Amino acid sequence: MPKRDDIKTILVIGSGPIVIGQAAEFDYAGTQACLSLKEEGYRVVLVNSNPATIMTDAEMADKVYIEPITLDFVSRIIRKERPDAILPTLGGQTGLNMAMELSAAGILDECNVEVLGTDLTAIKKAEDREAFRDLMNELGEPVPESDIIHNLDEAYTFVERIGYPVIVRPAYTLGGSGGGICHNEQELIETVTSGLKLSPVTQCLLEKSIAGFKEVEYEVMRDANNNAMVVCNMENIDPVGIHTGDSIVVAPSQTLSDREYQLLRDVSLKIIRALEIEGGCNVQLALDPDSYNYYVIEVNPRVSRSSALASKATGYPIAKLAAKIAVGLTLDEVRNPVTGTTFAHFEPTLDYVVAKIPRFAFDKFEQADRRLGTQMKATGEVMAIGRSWEEALLKAVRSLEIGADHLLLEEAENADEATLERKICFPEDDRLFFLAAALRRGQTIEQLHAKTKIDLFFLYKLSKTIELENRIKENPHNQEILAEAKRAGFSDAFLATCWNVDEQAIYDLRKAQNLFPVYKMVDTCAAEFESTTPYFYSTYEEENESTRSAKESVIVLGSGPIRIGQGVEFDYATVHSVWAIQQAGYEAIIINNNPETVSTDFSISDKLYFEPLTLEDVMHVIEIEQPLGVVVQFGGQTAINLADGLAKRGVKILGTSLEDTDRAENRDAFEKALEILQIPQPAGKTATSVEEAINVATDIGYPVLVRPSYVLGGRAMEIVESEEALKHYMTNAVKVNPKHPVLVDRYVSGQEVEVDAISDGENVLIPGIMEHIERAGVHSGDSIAVYPAQRLSSQVKNTIVDYTTRLATGLNIIGMLNIQYVVDGEEVFVIEVNPRSSRTAPFLSKITEIPMANVATRVILGENLIDLGYTPGLAPEKQEIFVKVPVFSFAKLRSVDTSLGPEMKSTGEVMGKDVTLEKALYKGFVASGTTMHDYGTVLLTVADRDKEEAVELAKRFNRIGFTIMATKGTASTLEEADIPVSQVKKIGENQETLIDYIRNGQVTLVVNTLTTGKRPERDGFQIRRESVENGIPVCTSLDTAEAILRVLESRSFELESMNASEVKQPKARV
């Protein structure tokens, strides 16, 4: 079938901000789709609220709207642009839900807009739990015994009939939001209440638990001619009961017999045909390990996280082809871009094994509930490719960047028996390491299978890895065993530990016997056809398929898995750097291991190496490619941390030298540089022991800001108000020693300002100055950033430009740098300098139209700013106002305190842009998922130090018609200021407490500032958690509350009577 010519303009709906369950895979899918549609000659309009994405670059679509993905704003765009069709299936759950809302509101009919890819009936059948169950029954496909419930009473009725455990699956939610496995009544009440609140249609499916069955996924494609094919099948190592996003996954499946594989394949194809999906679809199935019985768990009628994994695992570009199918092309008439000769209906064949391991953020959240279930908790993932399952697994383990270069974690090895058993029987994020520890202690694979239901095949492979470990230790420097270990995926670092030598000695031993990896191509066809894909993985075999080209090359190091503090912003910069290298006439090579991202799309770079970002793995690529140098500025802390080791091995680090990077990151060297440059910073010193830290804090006075050197995302950073709290921090949060010093600074509570700049060594370009709405003390990644700065005097701006220029030239920065300042009155202090790309670079690049990573890369390659057409100094400010608003995933991370501080907690961001600050903030808040009520009740419960400021906010809330509730202390302060307030009981008091009001939906906004002390049992923690669980916005900074108030005031009309003196209202009490 030829492509459709009756449609000209297509609206693509993006997935919005990065949250747990919906990450960079949709930037990858959306980018591919937009380019694919443009390639076919369509006019593409894109709406997405996330500025940190490649897909929101102006070149990706004919019209790019960075606006909230809400019914109101998308409707406005449709009425303005008049698209002929919308494509919602590449925007994750957000895209699907938006399409359903637009349809229900009558907008699609009103504007005559067609839905492409998957029609609304199919979306409803797949997403609505009841409709899906009915369809499966119609097809004769088994689903677990289940019931649709809309309230708790219906849940009780179901449980009385089938007993515990039961699984709760809310309808139309993302990443299992609000779902879980319930073993008792208490868990049922909590999970069902949460699930019904989070489901936009207030509907949950309760089903009989089939935990323990094998979980298998099929990624399938279908076109309008009813051609359907399987791109890839994947097997979860963890059985049913753990969300697939939190499971270790292998592709292709390893334990299915041919009969089982074909059985589940036929079911998947039958389902996609019955749903009449045109494009990609993910089918999740549960297989009884002891029979051929199976159940259909669910279907995602869209491109998903698994699609991104399947695309990278096979090389088959699902999103690109799904977009072509959506406009009428068929699988047998679209060429597979990997081979260039075969067509897209050929099912990919793999002659290698792929392992995916999720990456969690529990290093950030000590108090989080780490237990895994049906609600997703991972922020990102890594993928590795090998010739065997064990090789792929070990490569994936060292890609995680959790301080493990092997299946060996100190906590697991040192755990007592009770902890070991608990960690094995009740899975958490680190179960793999505890399984290895149990095998080392002599537990059998049969015992572990009985406890975990993990297939014996995988446990057997693990046990073989442990056996090989023992042989390595017993035979130091044995060449045969060394070769066997390398084929099995063992790292030099681990072998060095086993043989008590340094890593270099292992390398020398390998060099002596010419034991090096070769690189194999990912070609979708197991070498059956000629392929030109420049996509490689390493393995220890004979034939090398990657050859160095005659062109000079530059290697760019990626940023690895997405985690809090290092998100998609760094992948954005990596991709732009690659494009700039190509524009400058060099071959651009990427090394990265994240299957979700645009940078690991093989069509982006000249060559892609899908490898762990460790010194050993990166050096192997460098040895084969012999590049001009390596760029580390765009890969976040991951790449920066590799620079030292690479330089010591003679690799040229392009851009800022290692010595100058160290001067910016090492505290003592930085202080000396500031002294020479005569730039002030808050008083502080470096401490290398607990005693030293206490002495420094005593000298400069509390409160102090403490943090380790060389960190990203404010990890382990804290404001400490007493000696007792400092001792607790030094013993619990960091392992302080002379090699890992801790910085102790005077905490300045001023206005925080952030600057990104580019320096060529002589000239410094400052695209923009951003001010943070929250005062210093809240991590920059969690603050609302405003551009252009609204509250800075010309003198302060001039000082910032002067300091930035002096710092860039004084530290010999070549490329990008990010500086954070704190402004106290007219005084400006430097907090920190990061000699690399930052998370604000994509935001600033888009709004100033200065492609920062691109320009910085050209500078790194030796060009200067003036020749590139840029005038040094501060770029002219834009007339419009732009805000970057953080987005959090607290609903997924139970037990995590939502209060904001110096440690970063947000997973993503959105942008708001308009002609006034209030309008831009409104868009930012709405896009971030904050519900903006024009009237309602504000609950105020603030620390003593904030009470004076809270009085002014309360007056303003009262003026625009809000009712105010407060706890005793805050209420007394408000009453003294003659502000009408209802006093509510604190937690633990008799009668209705403020928690009851939150749960009953009687509160629309909570303002709760921290009393010091971080114990979660404190009242504040419970107030904040309850607010999040009940979908109520909660502000832990008065600055954020003031920003929301400004927006509400701008949307309100003041209502005052004409009487000269108003009678004061009586003070109400509740």
Swiss-Prot record:
Limits of the MGS-like domain: 930-1070
Domain of life: Bacteria
Region of interest (Carbamoyl phosphate synthetic domain), ranges: 547-929
Residues bound to ATP 1: 129, 169, 175-176, 208, 210, 215, 241-243, 284, 298
Binding residues for Mn(2+) 2: 298, 300
Positions bound to Mn(2+) 4: 832, 834
Cofactor descriptive note: Binds 4 Mg(2+) or Mn(2+) ions per subunit.
InterPro entries reported for this sequence: ATP-grasp, ATP_grasp_subdomain_1, CarbamoylP_synth_lsu, CarbamoylP_synth_lsu_oligo, CarbamoylP_synth_lsu_oligo_sf, CbamoylP_synth_lsu-like_ATP-bd, CbamoylP_synth_lsu_CPSase_dom, MGS-like_dom
Pathway: Amino-acid biosynthesis; L-arginine biosynthesis; carbamoyl phosphate from bicarbonate: step 1/1; Pyrimidine metabolism; UMP biosynthesis via de novo pathway; (S)-dihydroorotate from bicarbonate: step 1/3
Region (Allosteric domain): 930-1070
Pfam families attached to this UniProt entry: CPSase_L_D2, CPSase_L_D3, MGS
Chain sites annotated for binding Mg(2+) 2: 298, 300
Region (Oligomerization domain): 402-546
GO molecular function: ATP binding; carbamoyl-phosphate synthase (ammonia) activity; carbamoyl-phosphate synthase (glutamine-hydrolyzing) activity; metal ion binding
Residue ranges of the region described as Carboxyphosphate synthetic domain: 1-401
GO biological process: 'de novo' UMP biosynthetic process; glutamine metabolic process; L-arginine biosynthetic process
UniProt-listed Enzyme Commission number(s): 6.3.4.16, 6.3.5.5
Listed cofactors: Mg(2+); Mn(2+)
Binding site for Mn(2+) 3: 820, 832
Record HAMAP family: CPSase_L_chain_A, CPSase_L_chain_B
Family: Belongs to the CarB family.
Oligomeric form and interacting partners: Composed of two chains; the small (or glutamine) chain promotes the hydrolysis of glutamine to ammonia, which is used by the large (or ammonia) chain to synthesize carbamoyl phosphate. Tetramer of heterodimers (alpha,beta)4.
Functional summary from the UniProt entry: Large subunit of the glutamine-dependent carbamoyl phosphate synthetase (CPSase). CPSase catalyzes the formation of carbamoyl phosphate from the ammonia moiety of glutamine, carbonate, and phosphate donated by ATP, constituting the first step of 2 biosynthetic pathways, one leading to arginine and/or urea and the other to pyrimidine nucleotides.
UniProt name for this protein: Carbamoyl phosphate synthase large chain
This protein's encoding gene: carB
